[in-house]
From Swiss-Prot:
Alphabetical UniProt keywords: Late protein
Induction: Expressed in the late phase of the viral replicative cycle.
Keyword Transcription regulation (UniProt): no
Protein name, entry field: Protein OPG055
Gene label: OPG055
Keyword Oxidoreductase: no
């Protein structure tokens, strides 16, 4: 959607106001201190810069943390629409959130208001390797809020200088409408609330200038490299889970064959068919060889995963693998019962 902006002047190019490294990790969020209404208002973002040339839409990144407990509720229902396209997989649905619950992402000057809200769900393997999700007003801001993250999530704002390699619950990234690229999700499930902030009638009547969008080629390359790295990590994790399942099946077969052979030996006087015993022993030897091979392959994959996953995320990945294996075991038990 678009509209006419009075007093549009020469396009200005502005860089990010907050400096940060290309690849950034945010530490575990600390508890928020209680502040007065005035302090809270002063700490809010300001999306418009007043200059001699008029009001200018800022091309800055605003990264912060906010409590999200009040935003829980609608994301629990599983009525998302799956978007499975080339290089893009995610689940999305529109959402309605009262403005009062979104106060943390509003600007201090009251120049923007919440318009549309969307919930985006990412499961293991979901995400973007190319492109981005564009929602909201072309002359506004888009706030991306992490409501839940059980795995390793990351996002990149196209053209920006910051890549968040691991998003935590409560993390908020606000940026002039450039879209958002969710990096491939490693393990678990993540849910984000995307809030479109549109200019208010007051700002439209006053008029403001949309500057030329800045670009950062280094960040774009870094985001592409990180996406490919995550794809490799996901593939190795899936292989590791498969090896674990095959190992458990091989151990089970080995135990059953050994028990059967023991039974045959116990009743040697009754079971005189030596060929049967030889066949069982041969199967046991083959199973043991398979186990050894799987153990060696598993060790190699574990080494690869360790080299690709950040140390801070090791426990998350381990927990996900264990949970996936248990889930498969439960499903098999239900099928056999």
């Amino acid at each position: 959607m678009g509209f006419c902006i009075p007093s549009r002047s020469k396009m200005l190019k502005r860089g990010s106001r907050k400096s940060s490294s290309i690849l950034a990790r945010r530490p575990t969020p600390k508890k928020m201190n209680i502040v007065t209404d005035l302090e809270n208002r002063l700490k809010k973002n300001s999306y418009i810069e007043n200059t001699n040339q008029g009001n200018i839409l800022m091309d800055s990144i605003f990264v912060s943390t906010m409590p999200v407990e009040t935003l829980f509720g609608s994301y629990i229902t599983d009525d998302y629409e799956l978007k499975d396209l080339l290089n893009v997989t995610y689940n999305i649905k529109p959402d309605i959130v009262p403005d009062i619950k979104l106060d943390a992402v509003l600007d201090r000057d009251g120049n923007f208001r919440p318009a549309d809200c969307f919930l985006v769900k990412l499961k293991h393997r979901d995400g973007f390797t190319k492109g981005a999700l564009y929602l909201g007003h072309s002359a506004g801001f888009t706030a991306t809020i992490c409501l839940k993250n059980e795995g390793v999530s990351g996002l990149y704002i196209p053209g920006a200088s910051v890549i968040r390699s691991n998003i935590c619950q409560g993390d908020t990234v606000s940026r002039s409408s450039r879209g958002v690229q969710f990096l491939p999700q490693i393990g678990g499930e993540a849910i984000f609330l995307i809030v479109s902030l549109c200019p208010t009638k007051k700002l439209v009547e006053t008029g403001f200038v949309i500057p030329e969008i800045s670009s950062n080629d280094n960040a774009k390359i870094a985001a592409r490299i990180l996406s490919e790295k995550r794809k490799d990590t996901i593939a190795h994790i899936d292989t590791l889970i498969q090896h674990r399942q095959q190992l458990e099946l091989a151990y089970y077969n080995s135990c059953m064959l050994t028990e059967f052979l023991h039974y045959c030996n116990s009743y040697a006087g009754t079971i005189k068919e030596s060929l049967l015993k030889e066949t069982i022993q041969k199967d046991i030897n083959i199973t043991h060889t398979n186990i050894t091979t799987l153990l060696n392959e598993t060790a190699k994959v574990i080494k690869l995963v360790k080299s690709l996953v950040d140390k801070e995320d090791t426990d998350i990945v381990n927990n996900f693998i264990t949970k996936e294996i248990k889930t498969v075991e439960v499903l098999k038990q239900r099928q056999n019962s």
